[in-house]
Design a protein with these regions (language model features):
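N-terminal beta-strand motif that seeds the catalytic metal site of vicinal oxygen chelate
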Residues: 1-17, 62-65, 122-125
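Vicinal oxygen chelate
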Residues: 1-2, 67, 82-125
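Core segments of cupin and vicinal oxygen chelate
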Residues: 4, 10-48, 74
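Structural preference for long, well-ordered alpha-helical segments within the folded cores
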Residues: 21-22, 78, 115
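Conserved short beta-strand elements that form part of the metal-binding/catalytic scaffold
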Residues: 30-70, 87-88, 114, 118-123
Length: 125
């Protein structure tokens, strides 16, 4: 049953004002709802990204969510033009070149949001 329904990520934020500014103003997402302790942004295909206020944030340094994009080079050019710093990794895995890693099944790149969530863009192969 659940396989027939969309999912939406929920990221934790220790500073909702900074998250609002980053996702709305820097990334250009449309803020569709704001409640005490929660922001909801519209994304492609009718999906949504929820940012939930947290006193602790995330302690995980792994990827929390990813956008599937048709052209990772164009996505990175847009992100960089918006002032987003793309992460570079040298070892052990993944290794990036100009911010992009070959994951075998896809090309991927990562950036960090104001609450230290690791977010990716992924171009399937």
């Amino acid at each position: 049953m659940l396989g027939d329904h969309p999912v939406f990520p929920i990221l934790l934020s220790i500073d909702l004002d900074a998250s609002r500014s980053f996702y709305r103003d820097t990334l250009g997402l449309r803020l569709v709802r704001e409640d005490p302790g929660r922001l909801v942004f519209a994304c492609g295909g009718g999906t949504q990204l929820v940012i939930s206020g947290s006193t602790t944030g995330t302690r995980d340094t792994q990827t929390q969510m990813a956008w599937r994009v048709p052209d990772i080079h164009a996505a990175l050019a847009d992100l960089r033009a918006r002032g987003v710093r793309i992460e570079e990794y040298t070892a052990p895995d993944p290794v990036t070149t100009d911010g992009i890693a070959d994951m075998g099944y896809a090309w991927a790149a990562w950036f960090i949001d104001p609450s230290r969530n690791c977010v990716a863009v992924v171009e399937p192969k």
